[in-house]
A protein has these predicted regions:
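Walker A/P-loop
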Residues: 55-74
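Short, solvent-exposed secondary-structure boundary/capping segments
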Residues: 571-588
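Short, well-ordered loop/turn sites that connect or cap secondary structure elements
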Residues: 525-527, 552, 559
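Short beta-strand-centered aromatic/proline hotspots
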Residues: 565-568
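Helicase motor core with emphasis on the C-terminal RecA-like subdomain
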Residues: 52, 74-84, 89-168, 175-449, ...
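Extended, highly charged accessory segments
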Residues: 458-461, 465-530, 544, 588, ...
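A conserved acidic, glycine/proline-rich C-terminal tail/linker
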Residues: 540-556
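Conserved pre-motif I regulatory segment
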Residues: 11-60
């Protein structure tokens, strides 16, 4: 048991007995459970009794551990108690929220059957007393963006007792008078995949919706959080329960059964040499390995990191090994019907393999998976645990998986990642704090419910964990913006969204159109430019990026959903296709941002580099593995190929530079671009093992300082393992670098970075997102959807003028916060600079004729030199 501030977090390590757990359920529910399941799972031995006793509970447990049943069964039991007493009303008692519509559909199906079966037992036992005593069946319903108008009307007339929904639909419901009547008496709230929500603005949005709902309910509601890979648990618990009156965090019981399922996973290299083996042979080896795993298992799930990678793997498996309809792709750009069909077939055992990017990462029910393959690093330990954990769909089964590396740096990353999976470590997440765009959206929503006092509204907002530290001045500034108090915005058609009486200190609804505007524009997910793909018979296939379509010419062939299509023509935002006869595709590149390496994994890689690097010696005359290094590598969950490749890679770096950069030592190479004879570009290569989110900050501020000294704009190549500064033909010396590091270690880097990003495309794009969430730029006006291009144009025009209006304008301030704290990692970057200043992290500057081996991947994928994918192999060999 730990007391944190005024918040009592109780970590439970002693489960209740089976008898205590089962007697918490009523007779019919208990009999149904014992008939269906042989025993209680670890989380159920805690949860059944705790939820029955009305405690707030956070449950973390792996896929297949009965986690969902842990959250629901005590609630179902209580609702059947009400039914047996003739007191079950036509209203909502429990709201279940998840980030995925597909997960909601699963929950609906998985609850409907137990509810039917339990009620059938009651009918069998009670007979005609069912009618006499008004014993109703417990009902469940789904309310998402996919719910039809007819279903919504029926829910208003006869609301389900358990309502399954999404954060966005919940926000709509708390602004509907009819729905408020039905949900105003809820007793339970379940948040599934809580870590997935709490780490982003969808979760921030949800937290305010929950506190607004609590203000409507005016009583304690039991809160239940579910997730598979949650760390730190305190952060998730605080997000779940929030604060009560008096700024005291509510109590929460924490059930940590996250490692109750055994994982067997190995990192491997498809060949014994990832440099000198031809690309074609490496590809052949990868697909041969995948084919072997598929054939040796009843069902295999393959994860890639991109949708284009998913399409490529499906196409290659079909073309190389003759797979047909027994293999399928699953990702977010495919139609809902296609995704549901794949999920159903996989669950029924009709597919031997499904390839996915992230869409099957969370707990969608896909039945029993025997094996999981991860192609390349997942960039996160938690993500690896989540993905590998999809194998073995029961708490006693072993989750078996392989992580196949694609190059030498990827191999080190995969090896350290898998090692930490085995060591039961996770990455940490943090919740965005005081997001002013989401706040603005909810203030508008609140104004539609009633007239609010500013202090009353401020107190309510601060009950949500992400806003507990919100400054009153920022709250007032946001209300001033929404109240139309900023002069100069009218000519951009930005008008007041609420009535705000500054003297009285109150705000409320502004005009009849406010409700429509709110309902049509709420949510936190920004609009993307996507082109819908249709066949000639008007069947929707999926979507592609607009930028990709502009590159296509008539009769080009591309892959989507694991099938080939011929491009026929473009009609506005539609792409018309036909089934392709050719076997040569153009795989569509989705231009989504590449996943950044987590800070924790970056640090573990740095520690591994130091540990293995300390075993190396310049006296070593050959590449045979020394005893100390052999002992370290033998403890890693890697194959023989991986062991040999990693050691050779380290030896190459060490013999060339005498240094292995790590988490305590930054190597700075003063070198020149390879593969050019005249006008060689001068490069400064920083081997900083902190991940891209931090390296983004370090590279920008270093480039700013150096650029000012040299009077030039400096090109940056950014990676997870470091960054490269291209200074052209100019020369720097070590003293200059020392001075810059000294300056930036004590500088106000937040101010520097704001100046750096102010005119960038990144700022323009992110401001559009923030302005959309904050209702400054509408995405829909009176039912007419406003295109992304129009939104972008409107937001850029506003951004040009906003500094002159107020440099601390709430949505401008929020854009900077989102970039520096959500996209980048300002707190950790500041800590690293402090550690450099204090000497805890050291740096070494060396001159090299050519970039060292550890720099090669940065150069190749940064596109600085004229290295193409075709001659990458040759470059690395040289």
């Amino acid at each position: 048991m730990y007391a944190i501030g005024y918040f009592l977090i109780e970590y439970l390590d002693k489960p209740f007995s089976d008898e205590q757990s089962l007697t918490a359920l009523n007779l019919y529910v208990r009999n149904w459970f014992l008939d269906k399941f042989k025993e209680l799972t670890p989380p159920q031995k805690f949860a059944f009794k705790l939820i029955n006793d009305k405690f707030n509970v956070l449950i973390t447990a792996p896929t297949g551990s009965g986690k969902t049943m842990s959250g629901f069964l005590s609630i179902i039991s209580k609702l059947f108690d009400y039914a047996l007493e003739g007191k079950l009303e036509n209203r909502v008692y429990c709201i279940y929220v998840s980030p995925l519509r597909s997960l909601n559909n699963d929950i609906y199906k998985n609850l409907s059957v137990p509810l039917d079966e339990i009620y059938a037992q009651i009918i069998k036992n009670k007979g005609m007393d069912i009618i006499k005593n008004n014993i109703k069946k417990v009902s469940v319903g789904v309310r998402t963006g996919d719910t039809t108008q007819k279903e919504r009307r029926l829910q208003l007339i006869r609301p389900p007792n358990i309502l399954v929904t999404t954060p966005e639909s919940l926000a709509i419901m708390i602004n509907s008078k009819r729905f408020i009547e039905n949900i105003g008496g809820i007793e339970y709230l379940i948040i599934d995949e809580i870590h997935e929500l709490a780490s982003n603005k969808r979760g921030v949005h949800l937290s305010l919706s929950i506190e607004r709902l609590m203000a409507i309910v005016k009583k304690n509601v039991v809160r239940i959080g579910l997730g598979a890979t949650i760390y730190p648990l305190e952060e998730a618990a605080k997000f779940l329960v929030g604060y009560s009156a008096g700024n005291t965090l509510r109590e929460c019981k924490v059930i940590d059964a996250s490692w109750s399922k055994k994982l067997e996973v190995i990192a491997l290299s498809p060949v014994n040499d990832l440099v000198h083996t031809p690309n074609k042979d490496i590809d052949n080896a990868i697909y041969k390995k995948i084919d072997s795993i598929i054939k040796n298992n009843r069902s295999t799930l393959i994860f890639t990191n991109t949708r284009s990678g998913t399409e490529r793997v499906v196409f290659n498996l079909k073309s190389r090994y003759g797979y047909g309809n027994d293999i399928a792709a699953h990702h977010g750009s495919l139609s809902k019907d296609t995704r549901l069909e794949v999920e159903e077939k996989l669950k029924k055992g009709e597919l031997s393999c499904v390839v996915t990017s992230t869409s099957l990462e969370l707990g969608v029910d896909i039945g029993s998976i025997e094996n999981v393959i991860q192609l390349g690093s997942s960039k996160s330990i938690s993500r690896a645990v989540q993905r590998i954990g999809r194998a073995g769909h029961s708490f006693k089964s072993i989750a078996i998986g392989e992580v196949i590396a694609l190059d030498r740096d990827d191999l080190i990353e995969c090896s350290v990642m898998v090692d930490n999976v085995i060591k039961k470590r996770l990455d940490s997440f943090s919740t965005p704090k005081n997001a002013l765009d989401v706040l603005a959206q909810h203030i508008i929503g609140m104004s539609l419910n009633k007239k609010w006092g500013v202090d009353e509204a401020y107190d309510l907002v601060r009950k949500a964990y992400p806003y507990n530290t919100l400054d009153k001045n920022e709250f007032i500034a946001t209300i001033n913006y929404l109240g139309g108090k900023y002069l100069g915005l009218e000519h951009h058609r930005v008008y007041g969204k609420i009535w705000y009486d500054e003297k009285e200190g109150t705000f409320n609804q502004r005009g009849r159109l406010s409700q429509v505007m709110y309902m049509l524009n709420l949510g936190t997910i920004p609009d993307d430019v996507a082109i819908n793909v249709f066949t000639l018979d008007k069947k929707w296939v999926g979507s592609i990026e607009e930028e990709f379509m502009t590159k296509m010419k008539q009769h080009d062939i591309f892959a989507l959903g694991g099938k080939l299509y011929e491009f026929l023509e473009a009609k506005e935002t539609r792409c018309i296709v036909a089934a392709a006869k050719s076997l040569t595709p153009t795989i569509p590149p989705w231009f989504s941002e590449q996943l950044p390496l987590s800070f924790e994994l970056a640090q573990y890689i740095g520690e591994f580099r130091k540990k293995l690097g300390d075993t190396l010696s310049l006296k070593q005359k050959n590449k045979s593995i020394n005893k100390k290094a052999d002992a370290i590598l033998n403890l890693m969950p890697i194959d023989k190929n991986a062991k040999k490749i990693i050691y050779n890679y380290f030896i190459e770096q060490f013999l060339y530079t005498k240094i292995i950069p790590n988490n305590e030592l930054i190597l700075i190479e003063d070198t020149f671009e390879p593969n050019s004879t005249k006008n060689k570009k001068h490069l400064l290569i920083f081997h900083s093992m902190f991940g891209r989110r931090i390296n983004d900050i370090l590279s920008r501020i270093f480039a700013m300082e150096l650029g000012e000294i040299l009077d030039m704009n400096i090109d940056i190549i950014l990676s997870d393992n470091g960054f490269i500064l291209n200074i052209g033909e100019l020369i720097v010396n070590s003293q200059m670098i020392d001075e810059i590091i000294s300056n930036i270690s004590s500088a106000n880097i937040s101010t520097m970075l704001k100046h750096n990003i102010r005119k960038t495309e990144l700022m323009k794009r992110r401001f559009r997102h923030v302005a959309g969430r904050g209702f400054m730029v509408l995405r829909n006006y009176k039912g007419n959807k406003i295109g992304v291009r129009k939104q972008q144009l409107n937001s850029q025009m506003i951004l040009k003028d906003i500094d002159q209006i107020d440099k601390n304008f709430p949505l401008l301030k929020e854009t900077y916060r989102e970039i520096l704290y959500d996209l980048m990692d300002m707190p950790r970057a500041q800590q690293i600079l402090y550690d450099i200043k204090e000497g805890k992290i050291k740096y070494k500057i060396i001159k090299t004729k050519f970039p060292s081996p550890f720099a090669h991947k940065m150069l190749i994928f940064g596109g600085l030199s004229n290295i193409t994918l075709e001659n990458t192999q040759q470059y690395l060999q040289n």
